[in-house]
Each structure stands twice: as C-alpha cells, then as structure tokens.
C-alpha cells in the first residue's frame, strides 16, 4: 500500500497520515488531500461555511509563532488569562506559573487550552490586534471563505471557515517547522513540569 498524508475536517476533528485504502469518511465537511503529491482525493461540502470551534486555534498558533521572536522567553500566567474560559478546555496552567511561550503553544495545540490562548494573546499583540492579524494571515494564505472573531473558537457568527480553507491553512502551517513539531507531538512536559497530552483524533500508520 502506498502511504499518503491527508487531512480531513469535520466540525470538530481532523486526522492525517493514513493509508488511502479502506478509510471511512463520515464527517459533514471534508477535504482529503495527498500532501505528498498535492492532490485532492475527496471532498464533501468543502466550500460550505461552518463554525470551526477549536480548529480556530491552528491559526492562533501560527500567528503566535510568526509574531514571537523568542519562544523560550518566560511569561507569567495572570488572572486575566482565565477570563472567558469557563466551559472551555484548559491546559492546566495556574496563576503565577512561569512558563515559556513554547510551553503555551503546546498548551494551545495539545489540550486545546483556552488559558494558553489568552496568555499568548495578552502577552503579544493584545486581543484586537491579534484577531486582525489572524484575518490578515488568512487572506495571505488564500482563505477567502474564512473569518476569525476570536482566538479561542467561541461560537460567533463571524468566526467561521470551510474545510477547503482549513486545508489551505494546515498545508501552509506545516511548512513551518515549529508549527509542524508542535502539531505532530502527542505528549509534552512544560518547563514547570505540567504534562500535556494531545486531544487530536489521529489515524496514523
């Protein structure tokens, strides 16, 4: 069997790096790519706009990586980093924790932590400028059916995308070695000893 790499998006999950034979696609919104050959293998409702929830955090992470000069710079977790996080998944950081930006990025991607998102946003561009940068980056990539209204993925009529646009984003982002390393990591221990585990649904062979 020939191994291909693909990414599949439904409402809240994606998977990649599987064999092309005998896969079962049940997602409502799907873009299936062979990344080795840059070929679209299958699509379903791939240009239909939909709420993207935590998939928003892929763009959040990409923008952060492009904006932060030193990922090993120390950041102190503050109370403001937990504002608006009730009901959302968190990485597990606590007020007063001293961690690196790198730790926070793993906290965003692996456990989909809203606390990590807020800490990054608050310590870099600030909320409004960060959202503006997310939308500017989307346009640069060619995500013409995408709009970001927040960096966490909260329900908002102005926070949406398509599986086709998200495929463009992931394809672009994986060219960044830092993003690729974080995105493909399953487990990570932060500099202050917090163990993070990926919640991404994967199919890997």
For the regions a language model picked out, list residue spans one by one:
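Sec-dependent N-terminal signal peptides of Gram-positive bacterial secreted proteins and lipoproteins
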Residues: 2-20
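Short amphipathic alpha-helical surface micro-motifs
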Residues: 13-14, 56-59, 99, 198-201
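Active-site-adjacent loops and short helices of periplasmic peptidoglycan-processing enzymes
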Residues: 20-164, 168-177
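Extracytoplasmic
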Residues: 167-205
């Amino acid at each position: 069997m020939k191994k291909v790499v693909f990414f599949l998006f439904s409402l809240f999950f994606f998977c990649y790096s599987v064999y092309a034979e005998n896969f079962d696609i049940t997602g409502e919104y799907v873009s299936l790519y062979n990344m080795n050959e840059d070929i679209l293998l299958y699509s379903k409702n791939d240009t239909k706009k939909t709420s993207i929830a935590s998939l928003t955090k892929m763009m959040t992470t990409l923008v952060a990586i492009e904006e932060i000069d030193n990922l090993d710079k120390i950041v102190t977790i503050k109370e403001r980093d937990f504002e608006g996080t009730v009901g959302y998944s968190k990485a597990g950081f606590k007020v007063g924790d001293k961690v690196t930006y790198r730790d926070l990025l793993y906290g965003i991607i692996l456990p989909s932590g809203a606390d990590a998102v807020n800490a990054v946003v608050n310590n870099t561009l600030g909320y409004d400028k960060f959202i503006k940068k997310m939308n500017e980056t989307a346009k640069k990539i060619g995500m013409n059916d995408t709009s970001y209204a927040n960096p966490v993925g909260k329900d908002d009529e102005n926070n949406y995308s398509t599986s086709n646009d998200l495929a463009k984003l992931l394809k672009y982002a994986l060219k960044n070695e830092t993003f690729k390393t974080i995105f493909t990591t399953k487990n990570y221990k932060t500099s202050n000893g917090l163990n993070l585990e990926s919640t991404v649904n994967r199919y890997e062979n």
